[in-house]
Amino acid sequence: MDTNTLPPKPSISPSIASSFPTVKPFSSQNSTTSNPELSHIEKESNASSIIISQQPLSPSNISSAAPLDETHIATKASASLRNNNVSPHIPSPSSFSSSSSSDLDKSMLDEKHPDSEDITAVSLSTPPFPESIDVARFSSEEKKILSRIRRKLDLRIITCLWITYFLSRSVTYSISLSLTMNKHQGHSLLQTVSGLNYHTLSVGTGLSYVSLIIFDLPSNLLMTRADPRLWLSRIQVTTGIIGACHAVLGTKGSSASGFIALRFFNGLAIAGMWPGFAFYTSRFYRDQHLGKRIGWYYTAAQISSVATSLLSAAFQKMDGLHGLYGYQWMFLIWGVVAFTQGLFLPRWLPCIKHNQHNEKWISWIRIPKFLGFLKASENTGLTPEEEEVHAIYMAEMQVGKSWTLTDLADAFLDVRLWPPIFMFFGVVGISNGLVNYSSLIISEINENFSSVTVSLLVAPIWVFDAIAILTVLPLHDRFHKKMLFFVGSCLFVLAGLLITTFVSNVWGRYVGLLILGFGLGPTVPIIMTWVSSAMGPSHGDVGVAAGLAIVSGLGNLGSVVATSALYSGWKADTTFRRSNETMCGMVGIAIVASIVMHMVQKFNIRRFPFKRIYACLSERRKKELSVT
């Protein structure tokens, strides 16, 4: 158990400090009857009251405190702040659960009240009371306000992210479709680019995921230092530019090396988008409301796959128009639309409000007056009352908390970060393998299918994927059984792979692909929600940003395996049977990792047995605290 993980204690103004109640530490002789002030507090059990237990403070009873949710949310510090119209930032009980009792006592008793040596003045960054804390409940009116807040945020955030992800995935998914477009006319991507074959295709696709893995973490960490809206806008704009540049493929000077370079830069441009979406969303929604919202905008990937599959049939009709192949028109149109939409992201998305003094490196970009309509919005769209309630609702997530390299290292060494990597490895490898090679897999099922038929048969796979997201994730948020829902989804994936691999009937194998798509749908949103809820209360912004980026980045090694070593990258596997069998093994890895994650959280395991490393981190943290 780490004994040096307390956050630094900032200075606090007298006006705010006076809003905190002062409480004498309990002794063994104290009782409710001998303490009139405590008796009075315990009698106030309405919606905004708080009960202070007489149980002595210890790390065990702090860590066992129930997690804050909509019905258990505000500590006495938050209630006091609310009464004084101050936006609170309340530390999570879990944020100091790994500290020793002596360290907690020292940190909470180092400021003395002028009238008594036994009374503490509570800091905003330390636990408000030297006793175990029970929490108040939101009133029915506040619950209505929270529902209204979520509806307002959904309209701006989820709508914007859905469209952004839809266009981004359309740009990416167009590569897969271009492999078979106008094949019978000899105008597919494979037939018109000199030197491009299945091997170079696998190399290019694999390199796109390599660049994604390398740049996911720095891209997501920048979101804690820059305005996330500006960074997401940069990602979408560059994705559109690189997507449109794919139209040069098929011209006289194009080659396989040009395709490989474009795929690498596409991965570089898009790096940080998916974990960035999850990070941004987690700054507005708590765990019990986050999963289905990630699922909502994740359906954009599935709908995009359907839309691009259907629209590719129309693009094939444009083949030869103005001297361009059908796939060149597809790259150009999707790229330009994505670029244009990316310019409006800062204006569309609400800003993240917090009361931390965490200055952003980039919070605005100077633009000409005639482009003033693109300027980033400076409000959340909420009323002051709604912002106050939302601040209490999000208090445990430590939104806007500043961080150092020591905090980043501490997040990396959190045990809860690593099982989701293997979960992501398994399911995303399969998902991206299906995205990139679905048209080839269907063509292998029946070689007599035309290119248009193949494009149309791809679409229902992603319809089933979207249906699963919309039906499973609301149940996941309601019952909070992450492992159960994840393992159940993985079993659907496994069943789909086995049917597609071993059934001889053509349409039976296609049904296996539909089952596979249904199982894949809920897996990624569950993983991202799991990581955010585990890392946010303990590590703040840096924990969520780094955790999501590491899981997404290293987990995409599964995509490298699926796109480079399997399917078209496995020359001897002409029927894709061995590739599907390998995918079954990857599903097994994901299932085992989810069980490990469940056990790690059940037994509250957060640290590896690396005593020397944690000792070094503790010393470094002490030096940082002494400087501040």
UniProtKB/Swiss-Prot annotation:
GO terms for molecular function: solute:proton symporter activity. It is a multi-pass membrane protein. Residues 12-21, 48-64, 87-102 have a biased composition (Low complexity). InterPro entries: MFS, MFS_trans_sf. It comes from the Eukaryota. The chain crosses the membrane at residues 157-177, 203-223, 230-250, 259-279, 294-314, 324-344, 417-437, 454-474, 483-503, 511-531, 542-562, 583-603. GO terms for cellular component: Golgi apparatus; plasma membrane. SUPFAM superfamilies: MFS general substrate transporter. Residues 1-65, 80-125 are annotated as: Disordered. CDD domains: MFS_FEN2_like. Keywords: Membrane, Transmembrane, Transmembrane helix, Transport. Residues 103-116 have a biased composition (Basic and acidic residues). It is found in: Membrane. Residues 25-37 have a biased composition (Polar residues). Belongs to the major facilitator superfamily. Allantoate permease family. This is Uncharacterized transporter C1B3.15C. It comes from Schizosaccharomyces pombe (strain 972 / ATCC 24843) (Fission yeast).
